[in-house]
Amino acid sequence: MIGRIAGVLLEKNPPHLLIDCNGVGYEVDVPMSTFYNLPGTGEKVVLLTQMIVREDAHLLYGFLTPQERSTFRELLKITGIGARMALAVLSGMSVQELSQTVTMQDAARLTRVPGIGKKTAERLLLELKGKLGADLGAMAGAASQSDHASDILNALLALGYSEKEGLAAIKNVPAGTGVSEGIKLALKALSKA
């Protein structure tokens, strides 16, 4: 499986990207929330990915934050929700908005996402209840400890640490800490673990 991709962004054509990794171009689909936060073409980009293998294709979906990827994975577990629909949900609302929608059981908000009708919205609310809020709350709490949490996490992932280890280490980084200092503090926390 491909869990992370780092390279030069060659093409941006919503929701498709082409990323050059040492001479190999990977096509990656991303939600619009990720797309709007990408650097310009010709610049370096790092994405967390979910690879889906089908009979007729191997597909990569990319995300800037661990929260987006874990939410995408939760959506895929729901009967009747495929990768395209999960991508549409994450393009139609942020992870925090989805969490609030599930908490408030707001089916009407979900039906505003293209392709989601009333029954699908109700099934999403039912199956995500309790799962999404707890996971997102823990991850968002860890990530919000630092203004540069996603940059620090990406650096830790590049050094070979797991997402779980990285999120745990970020908890030790005070809010407002710069990226380089945050990486040092996170590595120090990981060395003690």
UniProtKB/Swiss-Prot annotation:
Record has S-adenosyl-L-methionine as a keyword: no
Residue segments, region Domain III: 144-193
Domain II, as annotated region: 65-139
Stored SMART domains: HhH1
Major site of localization recorded for this protein: cytoplasm
Gene Ontology, cellular component aspect: cytoplasm; Holliday junction helicase complex; Holliday junction resolvase complex
Localization: Cytoplasm
Gene3D superfamilies: 5' to 3' exonuclease, C-terminal subdomain, DNA helicase RuvA subunit, C-terminal domain, Nucleic acid-binding proteins
Stretch list, region Flexible linker: 139-143
GO BP: DNA recombination; DNA repair
Coiled coil: none
MF terms in GO: ATP binding; four-way junction DNA binding; four-way junction helicase activity
Region (Domain I): 1-64
Record's keyword terms, sorted: Cytoplasm, DNA damage, DNA recombination, DNA repair, DNA-binding
A UniProt-annotated Pfam family: HHH_5
UniProt cross-references to InterPro entries, sorted A to Z: DNA_helicase_Holl-junc_RuvA_I, Hlx-hairpin-Hlx_DNA-bd_motif, NA-bd_OB-fold, RuvA, RuvA_2-like, RuvA_C, RuvA_C_sf
Domain of life: Bacteria
Quaternary structure annotation from Swiss-Prot or TrEMBL: Homotetramer. Forms an RuvA(8)-RuvB(12)-Holliday junction (HJ) complex. HJ DNA is sandwiched between 2 RuvA tetramers; dsDNA enters through RuvA and exits via RuvB. An RuvB hexamer assembles on each DNA strand where it exits the tetramer. Each RuvB hexamer is contacted by two RuvA subunits (via domain III) on 2 adjacent RuvB subunits; this complex drives branch migration. In the full resolvosome a probable DNA-RuvA(4)-RuvB(12)-RuvC(2) complex forms which resolves the HJ.
NCBIfam families on file: ruvA
Domain notes: Has three domains with a flexible linker between the domains II and III and assumes an 'L' shape. Domain III is highly mobile and contacts RuvB.
Similarity comment text for this entry: Belongs to the RuvA family.
Function field: The RuvA-RuvB-RuvC complex processes Holliday junction (HJ) DNA during genetic recombination and DNA repair, while the RuvA-RuvB complex plays an important role in the rescue of blocked DNA replication forks via replication fork reversal (RFR). RuvA specifically binds to HJ cruciform DNA, conferring on it an open structure. The RuvB hexamer acts as an ATP-dependent pump, pulling dsDNA into and through the RuvAB complex. HJ branch migration allows RuvC to scan DNA until it finds its consensus sequence, where it cleaves and resolves the cruciform DNA.
Name this polypeptide is given: Holliday junction branch migration complex subunit RuvA
Organism lineage: Bacteria, Pseudomonadati, Pseudomonadota, Betaproteobacteria, Burkholderiales
